[in-house]
């Protein structure tokens, strides 16, 4: 590890560095010269960027007792009032309480109960792609939102979408714009949150006030629907109904905690899996050879007469590799979710003060050529020979995409299951390819990614067509599920 810390004390320079078009890349390039640890100091705020998996493991995992808190992001926490999200709560009793309730429903032994819902929603996606393949992005958003709405609230989202899909998309879009630390000056100077919204230069307050409305609506509206259904006896099983029923007369869980738990699964699940599915569509479009290999595997294992289900998972290793490579190639949260130190520490001879914001540059970690040879390429086969990878110490499965230590994403098992069944289902009946213009010429995609806190490929056109008449018949057979769900 380099013994020199790269240091920026100028607020203007630091702000530009963090807010640049794709900050994870910028910080990766700085790290090539400066080393694995980059230190930025601005208006009394200490920020450390970790560009290597080793540094992240040493600090965020092995020293979790010190590095498991979260910094208060003033724009998000105080101005936009996203203080209900336990993902951003400081380490402490409130966070433990929220995480304990959440984990009860989403730990690795709990998620198999959601497999029927995941299969049903994967099939709904297949039908939607058949009706309007050009709207694939909308269908992916609806698919992700529908899954978490059913699990969290017992609400069935119509195949064309509904108000809750739109609400989640709008609210998450807002928080992603504000999600990169330093995008707003108030993150550096928290006292600015007290500036009146009408004051010159207080546009962030006016913007935050509008965004807060979407945040509150996402928190309150689904809850109100569930309460009405419970009162009328029409509510189906869900995280919300289970917790509300269990909370009657209990002092251990309050209504606010229940609302927060359901809303964070709704918020996170509705946005993160769609980002990885966009990477999948892009990867298959630009690498048809990988798509064909995966389709051949599905055909061999599943056959032509049915769609994949979870019993096929262990027999479809190449499909698994594609899921992992989608997560590695463009990690959902390139700069991770920031940690914060709760006491002073020393690492590799460097003093790290209490209250330092620690940003794990996951994108940079996945571009480490010593760990991921040909790291910038989309190559699912890098995960094929697990024994060889272990011997060479490279191509680790990218579990760190879900975070580190005590703050690792507790919904990761549901996310992995959802990605797998959706990707396997699409591969079984569709071919994703480059589109053609009116003259029949192939349209080459521009491979660009958004720079928000949750990153996805910038919207691109693609062709999504059934692989065969047999595949088309399988898609149409799922219409029976739609009728049963009504």
Give each language-model segment a name.
Residues 1-80, 97, 119-124, 207, ...:
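N-terminal membrane-proximal hinge/A-helix region immediately C-terminal to the signal-anchor transmembrane segment
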Residues 1-34, 217, 306-349, 369:
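Conserved cytochrome P450 K-helix E-x-x-R motif and the immediately C-terminal K′/meander segment
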Residues 49-59, 68, 154-159, 163, ...:
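Classical protein tyrosine phosphatase
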Residues 477-486:
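Short, cationic low-complexity segments
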Residues 71-79, 112-278, 293:
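Cytochrome P450 heme-thiolate monooxygenase catalytic core
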Residues 263, 268, 385-419, 445-450:
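Cytochrome P450 heme-thiolate "Cys pocket" and heme-binding signature region
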Residues 346, 360-390:
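Conserved cytochrome P450 K-helix/beta-meander segment immediately N-terminal to the heme-binding cysteine loop
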Residues 68, 288-290, 412-459, 465, ...:
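Cytochrome P450 heme-binding "Cys pocket" and the immediately downstream C-terminal segment
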């Amino acid at each position: 590890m380099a013994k020199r810390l790269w240091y920026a004390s100028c607020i203007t320079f630091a702000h530009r560095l963090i807010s640049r078009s794709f900050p994870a890349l910028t910080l990766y390039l700085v790290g090539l010269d400066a080393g694995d640890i980059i230190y930025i100091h601005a208006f009394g705020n200490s920020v450390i960027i970790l560009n290597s998996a080793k540094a992240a493991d040493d600090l965020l995992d092995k020293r979790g007792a010190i590095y498991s808190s979260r910094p208060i992001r003033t724009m998000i926490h105080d101005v936009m009032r996203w203080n209900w999200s336990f993902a951003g709560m400081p380490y402490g009793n409130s966070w433990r309480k929220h995480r304990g309730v959440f984990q009860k429903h989403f730990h690795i032994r709990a998620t198999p109960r959601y497999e029927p819902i995941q299969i049903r929603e994967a099939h709904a996606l297949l039908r939607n792609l058949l009706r309007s393949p050009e709207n694939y992005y909308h269908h992916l958003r609806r698919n992700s939102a529908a899954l978490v709405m059913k699990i969290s609230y017992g609400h069935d989202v119509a195949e064309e979408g509904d108000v809750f899909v739109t609400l989640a998309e709008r609210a998450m879009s807002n928080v992603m714009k504000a999600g990169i630390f330093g995008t707003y000056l108030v993150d550096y100077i928290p006292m600015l949150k007290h500036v009146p919204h009408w004051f010159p230069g207080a546009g962030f307050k006016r913007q935050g006030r509008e965004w807060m409305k979407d945040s509150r609506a996402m928190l309150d509206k689904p809850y109100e629907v569930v309460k009405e259904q419970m009162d009328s006896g029409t509510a189906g099983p869900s995280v919300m109904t289970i917790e509300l029923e269990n909370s009657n007369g209990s002092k251990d869980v309050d209504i606010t905690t229940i609302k927060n738990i359901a809303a964070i699964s709704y918020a996170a699940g509705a946005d993160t899996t769609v980002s990885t599915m966009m990477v999948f569509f892009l990867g298959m479009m630009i690498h048809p050879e990988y798509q064909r290999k995966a389709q051949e595997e599905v055909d061999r294992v599943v056959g032509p007469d049915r769609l994949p289900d979870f019993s096929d998972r262990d027999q479809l290793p190449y499909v698994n590799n594609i899921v992992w490579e989608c997560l590695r190639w463009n990690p959902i949260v390139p700069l991770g979710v920031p940690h914060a130190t709760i006491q002073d520490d020393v690492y590799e001879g460097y003093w790290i003060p209490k209250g330092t914001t620690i940003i794990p540059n996951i994108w940079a970690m996945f571009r480490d050529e010593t760990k991921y040879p040909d790291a910038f390429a989309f190559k699912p086969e890098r995960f094929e020979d697990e024994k060889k990878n272990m011997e060479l110490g490279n191509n680790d499965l990218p579990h760190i995409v879900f975070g580190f230590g005590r703050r690792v994403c507790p919904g990761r098992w549901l996310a992995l299951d959802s990605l797998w069944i959706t990707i396997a289902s699409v591969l079984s009946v569709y071919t994703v390819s480059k589109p053609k213009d009116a003259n029949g010429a192939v349209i080459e995609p521009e491979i660009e990614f958004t720079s928000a806190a949750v990153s996805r490929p910038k919207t691109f056109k693609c062709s999504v067509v059934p692989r065969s008449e047999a595949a088309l018949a399988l898609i149409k057979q799922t219409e029976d599920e739609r009728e049963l769900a009504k």
